[in-house]
Amino acid sequence: LCRPEETVEAFRTALTPEVPAAVFTHVSNVFGMILPIQELARLCRERGVPFILDASQSAGCLPVHLEELGAAFIAMPGHKGLYGPQGTGLLLCGQTPPPLLEGGTGSESIRQEMPDFLPDRLEAGTHNITGIAGLLEGLRFVEKQGVQSIGSHERALTVQMGESLAQLPGVEVFRSKDPSQQAGVLSFRVSGMDCEELGEALGRRDIALRSGLHCAPLAHRTAGTLETGTVRASVSAFNVPQEIPRFVRELRQILSEKP
């Protein structure tokens, strides 16, 4: 699942003159594997193709630099690695895009177009002030802890979790052989056990996971897990190493009760 060189070569072949833009997920939301975005972005720059990055799983735990990548856009939600409220997010723009539609604004209602001064020209209507304030605090937390520190912490927990799960009978863990290519997301499945039922059983034991196809059927098809799905565990800056053995103990207990 994680072969950076093959990924780059496959994209090089697919990057024909007809391609108007290239959109990449920095980290797989299913398997946690990190794409070689530096090389992919370089190919886009060489061919003049806009590079767009989905940093949903990487913002706050991996370096994401707009200028360094030469990206046209980088999108990220606020409620994941930035520790903000749901309903918030950021869109980083390499250049100001031309407006498709314009409307009136509360600050200059007599005009039929947005004003040309900041911040009004970017803001219309009533804003999610509480969400923005919460996102700001999340950003301050990430800045204080350090992106590299958070990322290292999450990778260490993921390695610990992957090694522990792999020792359980009947458990198949989907992970990179190179820990540096794995973020804080890990998927697994249990032979002969429905992943939805397993997720619910763990949930009853206060282990929060997500089971199924994770809104990514093509990723599951590639991995050969489309029929079964997987159980996905993820870690954050607030998880500690002592939680991993408890998770594994609860899973082992469930497996021992399996008919």
Predicted regions and their residues:
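Pyridoxal 5′-phosphate
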Residues: L1-P259
